[in-house]
Structure formats: structure tokens, C-alpha cells
Amino acid sequence: MARIAGVNIPDHKHVVIALTAIYGIGKTTSLKLCKTVDIDPSVKVSQLSDAQLESLRTEIAKITVEGDLRRVVTMNIKRLMDLGCYRGLRHRRGLPLRGQRTKTNARTRKGRRKGTSS
């Protein structure tokens, strides 16, 4: 297994799909990376040479991925909460942020029903 950005990349998968195992890299970014490094996207990871893997590592190092990206996202949410803006308040209360209805539905965000006491 190749190790890129602290993540074990599966050997048996195509490069484009295998790179999506890294948090912050989707299919589009993966395709762009393959194009920049001149790697055929349909090649399996096990068939890549050490030089190709190293060039992939250097390109991925230029992108914010994994722990750094998680930290940035967390800090952005914390900033919204500290500002006290609408989105920050919704985060704080554990409610949907983007205008969805909450009278019914929104169970994923709100959690399980509390139940009515009679």
C-alpha cells in the first residue's frame, strides 16, 4: 500500500478512485492531480513507479488536505459561532443551517425524538 498524506492508498484500485481516500480530494481534484503529474487515471496504484508516487506526494502537499483541512473547517464553524451570526446560532443549537423546515423532518441534525410526556 502506498502512503500519501498520512493515508494508506489502496493498491488494487485505479489512481483516480484511490486518491479519493484522502480527505479533501474528490474525483475532480484527483483527475486534475493525475493530469498535472502525467499519470494515466486508469492505471492501478500498484503499477505506479516510485518517481510517480513521489511527484504525486509533492503535488498533494500543495493542497490543504486531511488534518489541516479538518482544522480549517472546524475553525470556520467556531468563528461563525463566536460571531453570533445566524449560521453560527444554528450550529450552536444543532439545527439545519440552510433554510430547511424544522417543524417536521430535520431529524438527522436534531437527533432522535425526545418523546412527549403525558
Swiss-Prot record:
The keyword Ribosomal protein applies. Gene3D superfamilies: 1.10.8.50, 30s ribosomal protein s13, domain 2 (4.10.910.10). Residues 94-118 are annotated as: Disordered. One of its GO terms (biological process) is translation. InterPro entries: Rbsml_uS13_C, Ribosomal_uS13, Ribosomal_uS13-like_H2TH, Ribosomal_uS13_bac-type, Ribosomal_uS13_CS. GO terms for molecular function: rRNA binding; structural constituent of ribosome; tRNA binding. GO terms for cellular component: cytosol; small ribosomal subunit. Part of the 30S ribosomal subunit. Forms a loose heterodimer with protein S19. Forms two bridges to the 50S subunit in the 70S ribosome. PANTHER family: 30S RIBOSOMAL PROTEIN S13/40S RIBOSOMAL PROTEIN S18, SMALL RIBOSOMAL SUBUNIT PROTEIN US13M. Located at the top of the head of the 30S subunit, it contacts several helices of the 16S rRNA. In the 70S ribosome it contacts the 23S rRNA (bridge B1a) and protein L5 of the 50S subunit (bridge B1b), connecting the 2 subunits; these bridges are implicated in subunit movement. Contacts the tRNAs in the A and P-sites. This is Small ribosomal subunit protein uS13. It comes from Legionella pneumophila subsp. pneumophila (strain Philadelphia 1 / ATCC 33152 / DSM 7513). The lineage of its organism: Bacteria, Pseudomonadati, Pseudomonadota, Gammaproteobacteria, Legionellales. The gene is rpsM.
